[in-house]
């Protein structure tokens, strides 16, 4: 176990390990925005505030901060604009029901899974057999030919038209979104068929009562975890690995050989929420733009909130890195475009635009300050606001709040999001302010 984390302006050494769970993360979904290092510091800052004040995380992501705050017993509300993130947050911090066991999932899902799979194999059986031979022989040249010839929603008008027809109310069965959009890209064809069949089984189990609504949500989280583990991509979903080199093909081959059903059952056995049932019963999750949440929050409660924000800090729009997870969660058959097979309606945040980030941060601060809430802001030293625009976040906070304290400056490293050239990580300082 690491040594106690010292200082951070608390006035004495504080052992922040009590806020960390035995597991490093509560979910294995690929996500680069987790704040595992910052989370215990935020939890200690929250603990020191008046005991009945609830905690709001306006960019909650996969809830590493909300999970740390669980140890304080504070009520937590998480918010995220992405559907997949709000689903995970709901399961981890706001669902009383524990996840079903792998055996319970088997009983609830297997028959429907096999039904959808059989329907898809009637159409794609020959293609699946060819893929299996290529993978068994580890034939890189054959793989490259098959990859180049595969037709999908982003490169074929007839497949795109089929997607559009489904969106307009056409026959959705058998489920085939991943097969038509992501096969021979992020996933193998057999894997995409399995993902679609798992999603069909989850929806059927929800409809028929074989799984409770919460149980079906847990199943979907396990499926997202299985998809994350099986995806042939560099730690995110902005792009997938292409077989342009022998090394790349070896990496793809390793991922293609993962069995989605087996991976799903493994992930199901790893699911575990934060906190105890009574704590989770008092929590809730919202799905909204962080700049538009405030009117809803005003009607939600009149309490004096402690608000935490970890806004996007780079020019990269994060929705691009998670579009596959978003599509598998919403399962709405969007159009697909480009090499990444992106959905066209990906969320774009002003926090990632150089011309808009200062105004967005001012708008966020104004909404919090005018309501008299305490604001905890996390931002790196190389963020778009300070490094590119020359605006000191601390000074910006002082324009809105009477007291602003820098409570943490900690060296860390950030992923370069799969950049092809240079270091995979950048050394930066993680900064944390408290404003009230």
Predicted features along the sequence, with ranges:
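SAM-dependent methyltransferase catalytic-core segment centered on the flexible catalytic loop
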Residues: 314-371
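Class I S-adenosyl-L-methionine
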Residues: 394-436
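Conserved phosphoryl-transfer catalytic core
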Residues: 91-174, 181
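S-adenosyl-L-methionine
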Residues: 2-56, 64-71, 86-88
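Conserved SAM-binding motif I beta-strand of class I
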Residues: 76-80
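Conserved Class I SAM-dependent methyltransferase catalytic core
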Residues: 351-405
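Conserved glycine-centered beta->alpha loop in an early N-terminal alpha/beta scaffold
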Residues: 59
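SAM-dependent nucleic-acid methyltransferase catalytic core
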Residues: 17-19, 39, 44, 64, ...
């Amino acid at each position: 176990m690491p040594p106690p984390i010292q200082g951070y302006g608390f006035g004495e050494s504080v052992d922040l390990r009590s806020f960390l769970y035995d597991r490093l993360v509560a979910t294995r979904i690929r996500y680069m925005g987790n704040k595992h290092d910052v989370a215990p510091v935020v939890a200690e800052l929250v603990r020191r505030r008046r005991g009945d004040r609830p905690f709001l995380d306006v960019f909650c992501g996969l809830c590493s901060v909300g999970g740390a705050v669980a140890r304080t017993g504070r009520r937590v509300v998480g918010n995220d604009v992405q559907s997949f993130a709000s689903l995970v947050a709901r399961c981890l911090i706001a669902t009383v029901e524990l996840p079903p066991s792998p055996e319970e999932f088997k009983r609830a899902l297997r028959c429907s899974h096999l039904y959808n799979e059989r329907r898809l194999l009637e159409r794609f059986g020959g293609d699946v057999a060819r893929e299996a031979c290529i993978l068994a022989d580890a034939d890189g040249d054959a793989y490259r030919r098959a990859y180049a010839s595969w037709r999908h929603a982003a490169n074929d008008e007839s497949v795109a038209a089929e997607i559009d027809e489904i969106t307009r109310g056409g026959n959705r069965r058998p489920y085939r979104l991943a097969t038509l959009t992501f096969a021979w890209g992020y996933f193998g064809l057999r894997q995409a068929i399995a993902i679609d069949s798992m999603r069909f089984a989850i929806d059927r189990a929800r409809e028929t009562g074989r799984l409770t609504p919460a149980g079906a949500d847990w199943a979907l989280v396990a499926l997202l975890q299985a998809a994350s583990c099986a995806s042939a991509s560099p730690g995110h979903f902005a792009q997938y690995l292409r077989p342009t080199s022998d090394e790349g093909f070896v990496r793809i081959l390793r991922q293609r050989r993962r069995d989605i059903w087996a991976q799903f059952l493994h992930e199901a056995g790893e699911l575990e929420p934060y906190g105890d049932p009574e704590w989770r019963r008092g929590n809730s999750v919202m799905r909204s733009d962080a700049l538009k949440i405030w009117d809803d929050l005003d009607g939600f409660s009149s309490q004096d909130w402690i608000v935490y924000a970890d806004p996007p800090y780079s020019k990269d729009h994060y929705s691009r890195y998670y579009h596959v997870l978003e599509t598998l969660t919403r399962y709405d058959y969007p159009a697909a475009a480009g090499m990444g097979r992106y959905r066209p309606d990906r969320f774009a945040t002003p926090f990632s635009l150089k011309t808009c980030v200062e105004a967005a941060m001012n708008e966020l601060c104004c909404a919090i300050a005018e309501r008299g809430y305490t604001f905890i802001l996390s931002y790196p030293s190389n963020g778009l606001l300070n490094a590119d625009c020359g605006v000191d976040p601390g000074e910006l906070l002082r324009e809105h709040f009477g007291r602003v304290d820098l409570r943490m400056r900690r060296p860390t490293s950030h992923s370069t999001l799969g950049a092809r050239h240079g270091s995979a990580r950048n050394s930066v300082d993680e900064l944390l302010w408290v404003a009230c």
